[in-house]
Amino acid sequence: MTTAAIRGLQGEAPTKNKELLNWIADAVELFQPEAVVFVDGSQAEWDRMAEDLVEAGTLIKLNEEKRPNSYLARSNPSDVARVESRTFICSEKEEDAGPTNNWAPPQAMKDEMSKHYAGSMKGRTMYVVPFCMGPISDPDPKLGVQLTDSEYVVMSMRIMTRMGIEALDKIGANGSFVKCLHSVGAPLEPGQEDVAWPCNDTKYITQFPETKEIWSYGSGYGGNAILAKKCYALRIASVMAREEGWMAEHMLILKLINPEGKAYHIAAAFPSACGKTNLAMITPTIPGWTAQVVGDDIAWLKLREDGLYAVNPENGFFGVAPGTNYASNPIAMKTMEPGNTLFTNVALTDDGDIWWEGMDGDAPAHLIDWKGNDWTPESDENAAHPNSRYCVAIDQSPAAAPEFNDWEGVKIDAILFGGRRADTVPLVTQTYDWEHGTMVGALLASGQTAASAEAKVGTLRHDPMAMLPFIGYNAGEYLQNWIDMGNKGGDKMPSIFLVNWFRRGEDGRFLWPGFGDNSRVLKWVIDRIEGRVGADETVVGHTAKAEDLDLDGLDTPIEDVKEALTAPAEQWANDVQDNAEYLTFLGPRVPAEVHSQFDALKARISAAHA
C-alpha cells in the first residue's frame, strides 16, 4: 500500500507498517479530516500545539515566572469527568462483560458509533499518536496508536505516555498495537467558527476485548479521551492480563526506604480521590524514613522467579487538584514547580497563576473560576471543579524512583486495599493469606467521589479492588485471575493488608491524622512482613495494636488511635447482608475460594457477636 491512499496526509508516513497504514486510510474515509499528521512527540511539537490552542482559546498560558511552560484548559461544563453510564464493554457474549459493565453487541455498537464517526473530523486534523505502555526499553512492550482530532489529547498523551517516533519505531513494520479511535464529535463546516472546548452531548467510551480495540466519541476529557489511561491501561490490559497470566490493577506503586537504607515496595488500591496520589507521593513523618514514587494510579503486576513485580504503564501524573497543598502532598506541589504542567478546570488568579480549593493560604480576593466567570470568596460555587486536574510528567518529581524507568519493575512486598469508611474498618489489618486478601479486596466498599460525573457524593458503593469501573471483562473471572495468580505464586506472593485512613469518632472527627503520618502504618506493615510485631485477632484479620505503631511525635490522642484500630463485630454484622448480596450480584463466576473465605468471615463475626 502507498501513503498516497491516506487522503490529507502531511508529508511522508514515517512507518511501513501496512496494518497501521490501512487502518489509518480506512479511518480517514470514515472521519473525513482535513489533514492527517503523525505526531513525533517532540518538545517543539508540544510548544507549537500549545501556541495554536492559546490562539484558539482552548488554553490559557500561565504566568511564565510562576508556572513556566504551563497552561490552563477549561472544559465544557458537560464534559468534566468519566461517564460510566456511557462506558461499554462490547464482548461477543453479554455474560463475558459481566454484571459490573454496560454491554452492547460489538457489531451493533460499531454500526451505531460509525454513524456518529462519519464526517465527525471535518474541518479538523486527525493526529496519529503512537504510544508505549511502560518503559520504552521493554523488549516486549505493549503498544498502541490513537487517532484523535483533539490537540489537548495529544498534549496530554505526551505527558502521560511514552509517545511519538520512539513508540512508532517499537511498533516497526510488523508489530501489533491496540487500535484507539477518538473524536470529540464536533465537525467544522467551511467558515464555521470553532469553540474553545469542542465536544458532543452524545458520548460513547467503548472497549472491544476480543479485538483489543477502543472507540471513544463525544468527550475531550481525561479518561474518556486519553485512551492510554483507563481504557487501555486497565480495561483492555486487564483482558490481556487474564489471557497472558498477569494482572492490571488500579494501584499506586510506592518505594519506602528505612533508616538502614533497605527498600520495600508497596502497591495499593484505593477508589478515585481516596488519597491514593497522596500516599504514592508520601513524605514520611518518621525520622530516617524516605519514600519515592514509582506510580500513582496503575500497576501492571507480573510473576517472576522470586516474586510479584510491578511496572507503572504510565509516564505522568493525572492528579485531582482540589485538596492538594504543601501540607497534604508537598511532592505533588514540588513536581509542578518547574512548570511543564497542563491544568484543567482549576481557577485562574489575576496574576496568571492557578488556584483551587484546599490550596495553601487564603483564597485570593478575586479569581476567574473554572467556567470563566468572576469569583470571590463570597461566591456560592467552587472556583475549581471538584474533579479538576493537573497533568505533569513523573520524571519531574523530586521523589521519582529511578526504577520507574526499569521495564522489569519492582518486587512488591505488600499490597494494600483501602477505601473511605467512617466506621467498621480498622486503621490497618493484615489478611490471613492471599485467598483471604482476595475476598477482602472483592468486598472493598467506599464513599462516592466526584471523579465520576454521575456519582451521588457520600453514598457507600462496592468497589472490588478499586477496579469497579475498570474491569474489562466478567468481574467473577477477574477475581478468579487473582486466585489463579496466588496459586501460581504460592509463598512468593506479597502479603495483603486492609487500611482505612478515614475512621471517625462519634462527633464526626477523624481518628487518624493521615497524610504523612500514614508512614507510621506503612512501618507497621513492614514490621509485620519482617515478623517483628504481633497483632490483635479481629473478625477481619491480624489488626495492629496501638502500642506497636510508632507514634512518637504524633499529636493524636492514643484513645483515638485505639478506637481507629477496632473492628466492631456488630458493625461488621451490619455489612454481612449487603456483602452477601453483592457477591450474588457478581454472579456465578465468582470463585469458590472467595465464597468460602466469606463464609469464614461470617463465622468469625457470629462468634464475636454471640
UniProtKB/Swiss-Prot annotation:
<dbReference type="InterPro" id="IPR035077">
    <property type="entry name" value="PEP_carboxykinase_GTP_C"/>
</dbReference>
<dbReference type="GO" id="GO:0004613">
    <property type="term" value="F:phosphoenolpyruvate carboxykinase (GTP) activity"/>
</dbReference>
<feature type="binding site">
    <location>
        <position position="297"/>
    </location>
    <ligand>
        <name>Mn(2+)</name>
    </ligand>
</feature>
<feature type="binding site">
    <location>
        <begin position="515"/>
        <end position="518"/>
    </location>
    <ligand>
        <name>GTP</name>
    </ligand>
</feature>
<keyword id="KW-0479">Metal-binding</keyword>
<protein>
    <recommendedName>
        <fullName>Phosphoenolpyruvate carboxykinase [GTP]</fullName>
        <ecNumber>4.1.1.32</ecNumber>
    </recommendedName>
</protein>
<dbReference type="GO" id="GO:0019543">
    <property type="term" value="P:propionate catabolic process"/>
</dbReference>
<feature type="binding site">
    <location>
        <begin position="387"/>
        <end position="389"/>
    </location>
    <ligand>
        <name>substrate</name>
    </ligand>
</feature>
<dbReference type="GO" id="GO:0005829">
    <property type="term" value="C:cytosol"/>
</dbReference>
<dbReference type="GO" id="GO:0071333">
    <property type="term" value="P:cellular response to glucose stimulus"/>
</dbReference>
<keyword id="KW-0464">Manganese</keyword>
<dbReference type="GO" id="GO:0046327">
    <property type="term" value="P:glycerol biosynthetic process from pyruvate"/>
</dbReference>
<dbReference type="GO" id="GO:0042594">
    <property type="term" value="P:response to starvation"/>
</dbReference>
<dbReference type="GO" id="GO:0006094">
    <property type="term" value="P:gluconeogenesis"/>
</dbReference>
<feature type="binding site">
    <location>
        <position position="272"/>
    </location>
    <ligand>
        <name>substrate</name>
    </ligand>
</feature>
<feature type="binding site">
    <location>
        <position position="230"/>
    </location>
    <ligand>
        <name>Mn(2+)</name>
    </ligand>
</feature>
<keyword id="KW-0963">Cytoplasm</keyword>
<feature type="binding site">
    <location>
        <position position="250"/>
    </location>
    <ligand>
        <name>Mn(2+)</name>
    </ligand>
</feature>
<feature type="binding site">
    <location>
        <position position="82"/>
    </location>
    <ligand>
        <name>substrate</name>
    </ligand>
</feature>
<feature type="binding site">
    <location>
        <position position="389"/>
    </location>
    <ligand>
        <name>GTP</name>
    </ligand>
</feature>
<feature type="active site">
    <location>
        <position position="274"/>
    </location>
</feature>
<keyword id="KW-0547">Nucleotide-binding</keyword>
<dbReference type="InterPro" id="IPR013035">
    <property type="entry name" value="PEP_carboxykinase_C"/>
</dbReference>
<dbReference type="InterPro" id="IPR018091">
    <property type="entry name" value="PEP_carboxykin_GTP_CS"/>
</dbReference>
<dbReference type="InterPro" id="IPR008210">
    <property type="entry name" value="PEP_carboxykinase_N"/>
</dbReference>
<keyword id="KW-0456">Lyase</keyword>
<dbReference type="GO" id="GO:0030145">
    <property type="term" value="F:manganese ion binding"/>
</dbReference>
<dbReference type="InterPro" id="IPR035078">
    <property type="entry name" value="PEP_carboxykinase_GTP_N"/>
</dbReference>
<comment type="pathway">
    <text>Carbohydrate biosynthesis; gluconeogenesis.</text>
</comment>
<comment type="function">
    <text>Catalyzes the conversion of oxaloacetate (OAA) to phosphoenolpyruvate (PEP), the rate-limiting step in the metabolic pathway that produces glucose from lactate and other precursors derived from the citric acid cycle.</text>
</comment>
<dbReference type="GO" id="GO:0005525">
    <property type="term" value="F:GTP binding"/>
</dbReference>
<feature type="binding site">
    <location>
        <begin position="273"/>
        <end position="278"/>
    </location>
    <ligand>
        <name>GTP</name>
    </ligand>
</feature>
<dbReference type="GO" id="GO:0033993">
    <property type="term" value="P:response to lipid"/>
</dbReference>
<keyword id="KW-0312">Gluconeogenesis</keyword>
<keyword id="KW-0210">Decarboxylase</keyword>
<comment type="subunit">
    <text>Monomer.</text>
</comment>
<dbReference type="InterPro" id="IPR008209">
    <property type="entry name" value="PEP_carboxykinase_GTP"/>
</dbReference>
<feature type="binding site">
    <location>
        <position position="420"/>
    </location>
    <ligand>
        <name>GTP</name>
    </ligand>
</feature>
<dbReference type="GO" id="GO:0006107">
    <property type="term" value="P:oxaloacetate metabolic process"/>
</dbReference>
<comment type="similarity">
    <text>Belongs to the phosphoenolpyruvate carboxykinase [GTP] family.</text>
</comment>
<dbReference type="Pfam" id="PF17297">
    <property type="entry name" value="PEPCK_N"/>
</dbReference>
<keyword id="KW-0342">GTP-binding</keyword>
